[in-house]
């Protein structure tokens, strides 16, 4: 039942040319607890490619709440391939907030399993793809518990030939009675 008043923060910086970063973040928010976690990511620009392949595992307990916020502003030589997963128990709330503004190529597709009755998930994402960038973002949710709800809400901006791709998947299992889901994606292309 602990509520953490001040957000926990982490910052990942890849500081060497031709290097890879493979961090693993594990967060367990136990029954009745509340946490906001903020993750920042960046790297200086090098003349060779770099790789970020992070892994995030999140567990949201009964009647707990977790907001996981990510701001990614990688340099244009970065390949950013993340794996982010969450499991939410009864009455739990998972909130994803994602800002993707950098990298040469990104694939960001967090997945949430709404396992417990009355659990819910919300994903809010903003993506900006400029010259030479290919950013593939979105979210996936699997409803397995009764009376679960999810909302995926994204906005993207593409400029100077940048490519922004949105994908989402919503699966409602046979035992997820009275569950509901909504997906909203809006894109703005600033090229002629």
Please place each PLM-identified region on the residue numbering:
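Conserved beta-strand/loop scaffold segments within soluble protein domains that form the structured core
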Residues: 1-192
């Amino acid at each position: 039942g602990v509520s953490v008043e001040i957000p926990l923060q982490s910052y990942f910086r890849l500081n060497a040319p031709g290097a890879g970063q493979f961090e693993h973040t594990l967060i367990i928010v136990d029954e009745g607890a509340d946490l906001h976690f903020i993750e920042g990511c960046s790297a200086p620009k090098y003349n060779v490619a770099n790789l970020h392949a992070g892994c995030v595992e999140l567990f949201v307990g009964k009647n707990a709440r977790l907001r996981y916020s990510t701001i990614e502003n990688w340099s244009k030589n970065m390949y950013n391939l993340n794996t982010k997963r969450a499991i939410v128990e009864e009455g739990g709330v998972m909130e994803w907030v994602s800002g993707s503004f950098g990298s040469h190529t990104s694939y960001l597709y967090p997945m949430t399993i709404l396992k417990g009755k009355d659990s819910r998930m919300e994903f809010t994402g903003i993506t900006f793809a400029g010259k030479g960038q290919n950013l593939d973002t979105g979210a996936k949710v699997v409803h397995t518990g009764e009376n679960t709800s999810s909302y995926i809400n994204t906005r993207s901006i593409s400029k100077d030939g940048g490519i922004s791709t949105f994908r989402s998947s919503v699966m409602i299992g046979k035992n997820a009675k009275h569950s509901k889901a909504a997906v909203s994606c809006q894109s703005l292309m600033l090229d002629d």
